[in-house]
Amino acid sequence: MDEPAYRRVVVKLSGEYLAGSQPFGIDQPTVDRIAGDLASARALGTEIAVVVGGGNIFRGVEVSSRGVSRPTGDTMGMLATVMNCLALEAALERRGQSARALSAFVMPEVCELFTRNAAHKYLSEGRIVLLGGGTGNPYFTTDTTAVLRAAEIGAQAVLKATNVDGVYSSDPKKDPSATRFERLSHSQALEGGYKVMDATAFALARETSLPIIVFSIAEPGSIGAILKGTGRGTIVAS
């Protein structure tokens, strides 16, 4: 078997994707399919941590205009990410893939607190580590969390799973003439204003020289394909 392209990665999943075709909530068949993809990718030999959003359950930004303060709303959203991590952890364990959820918040009855040492330990043991609670601070997205955690644990890349197969010059769903980039620098991604990740995430990735691979999660097996170097996507790297 060929060596995977990366020894350790952070996979960033959107919470909305876990809802499947539903407007909100957790769609179990979708969670099970993603768990299968993650387990298959782990079998290639790459150590995998996962940061998942919480938008399928709660979005703090949306309630800030309805009387809930932004910090409170963001905290509620970060707690939603822990729920998604627990759902993925259970789905992975059912498949026989050992997993461990870690949270940025202290909640010992629910899951262990994130520390770099704990993440290193579980990753080296072959577990898939699920990172919930965002950064633990309001105003930071889970995209930024993914880059931050990747830098902290020494990951070699962030795999940003989306519903399109890379970064395009414009929205390919609205503009049939949109072209896909094979490669961009972090600075080009920032200056171009591409909406695939927020500016803070791109800036932190640039500062830490961390590659981001943007790809579509819709195709089963796409995570493994990226790790093997055969997947379709856009590499954002300096």
UniProtKB/Swiss-Prot annotation:
Activity modulation comment: Inhibited by UTP.
Enzyme class label: transferase
Record-level GO BP terms: 'de novo' CTP biosynthetic process; UDP biosynthetic process
GO molecular-function term, one example from the UniProt record: ATP binding
Enzyme Commission number(s) from the entry: 2.7.4.22
Xref: CDD domains: AAK_UMPK-PyrH-Ec
Catalytic activity: UMP + ATP = UDP + ADP
Gene3D superfamilies documented for this protein: Acetylglutamate kinase-like (3.40.1160.10)
Pathway where it operates: Pyrimidine metabolism; CTP biosynthesis via de novo pathway; UDP from UMP (UMPK route): step 1/1
Swiss-Prot/TrEMBL keywords: ATP-binding, Cytoplasm, Kinase, Nucleotide-binding, Pyrimidine biosynthesis, Transferase
Pfam families: AA_kinase
Record has Disulfide bond as a keyword: no
Subcellular location(s) of the protein: Cytoplasm
Secretion signal, residue range per the UniProt entry: none
Main subcellular localisation: cytoplasm
Binding site for ATP: 12-15, 55, 59, 162-163, 168, 171
Residues reported to bind UMP: 54, 74, 135-142
Gene Ontology terms: cellular component: cytosol
Family of this protein: Belongs to the UMP kinase family.
Assembly, per entry: Homohexamer.
Biological role: Catalyzes the reversible phosphorylation of UMP to UDP.
The name this protein goes by in its record: Uridylate kinase
Protein's organism: Nitrobacter hamburgensis (strain DSM 10229 / NCIMB 13809 / X14)
Gene: pyrH
